[in-house]
A protein has these predicted regions:
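Beta-loop-alpha module in the N-terminal Rossmann-like domain of NAD(P)-dependent dehydrogenases
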Residues: 19, 51-111
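Contiguous beta-strand/loop segments that form the cofactor/metal-binding neighborhood of enzyme cores
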Residues: 179-256
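Hydrophobic residues in well-ordered beta-strands that form the structural core
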Residues: 55, 94, 119-121, 147, ...
Length: 278
């Protein structure tokens, strides 16, 4: 198997299983080691790939000769695993959010640059097949502003409800919308943000915002606001609406887009597996 990329996984939960399915489609990959604190998870992953199971990522990184490591853990669990993988010369794929502090993120980034290693983060939406068409249309427009959304209910996992373990919805979920906005519109130069609580007062051990709004100014002068909400029990909205001088674009998260001009409507839906962006 020396001709294959030897991959190890830190974390074998929900998002890791999403990636497992794509690993199985890539012939040049050999998942050789898996690590998780939950016995059932790591046992199942180990059997799936005939990989060596570990409970401690430190032991895995010490014993295995890995080319790359996937880090698929809850936000607050990023406790040095990336830095140790970098020390061992491993390329990285880190699920978002990559860190809950800029200090740690900057340390990882500096380590990657010093070693000349490749790093990817779990922002696959920009690799949807219709996104180039969407971006090409927007690049020709005079854009007034946009509104983005990640509004829905509250995920059931325990760590999502606490700021110290999750970072809040804007950090853990809406980060996909922020990434798409940066891909479509460029870099941000100014930010204003507001949030509120008091809607989800029947949820135990919950201390993040129920709703928030982040207004940004981009290098081009464009302004846009992205909303987050985890309070909606009757449906929500994920995507971006862009209002232009000569048209309007409605992007549905991982679904497609609709362009409306004065005498024309263009619609497109995804036909590819966005997870293959990894």
């Amino acid at each position: 198997m020396a001709d294959k990329v030897r991959v190890g996984f830190v974390g074998c939960g929900g998002i890791a299983n999403f990636h497992f399915g794509h690993m199985e489609k890539i012939e040049a990959v050999d998942v050789t080691a898996v690590c998780d604190l939950v016995d059932e998870r790591v046992k199942k992953a180990s059997e799936r790939f005939d990989a060596t199971p570990y409970e401690d990522y430190r032991v895995m990184l010490e014993k295995e000769e890995l080319d790359a490591v996937y880090v698929c853990v809850e936000p607050s669990a990023h406790d040095g695993m990336e830095l140790l993988a970098i020390e061992k010369g491993c390329h990285l794929f880190v699920e978002k959010p990559v860190a809950l502090s800029m200090d740690y993120a900057n340390k990882v980034n500096a380590g990657l640059k010093a070693k000349g290693l490749i790093n990817g983060a779990g922002f696959q939406d920009r690799y949807l097949d219709f996104v180039p068409r969407m971006k090409a249309w927007l690049d020709m427009q005079d854009i007034g502003f946009f509104n983005g959304y990640w509004v829905g209910g509250m995920p059931g996992v325990w760590w999502w409800r606490r700021r110290e373990t999750c970072g809040g919805q804007a950090v853990e979920q809406t980060i996909h919308t922020f990434d798409m906005a940066r891909y479509l519109f460029g870099e941000v130069v100014a930010v204003q943000a507001m949030g509120r609580r008091g809607i989800m007062d029947d949820v135990e051990n919950y201390d993040t915002e129920d709703a928030s709004a982040v207004t940004m100014t981009f290098e081009s002068g464009l302004i846009g606001t992205i909303y987050s909400g985890c309070f909606s029990g009757c449906g929500g909205k994920n995507g971006i609406d862009v209002f232009c001088k000569n048209g309007r674009l409605e992007y549905t998260e991982r679904g497609g887009f609709k362009i409306t001009e004065k005498n024309m409507t263009i619609e497109a839906k995804t036909g590819n597996d966005y997870g293959q962006g990894e």
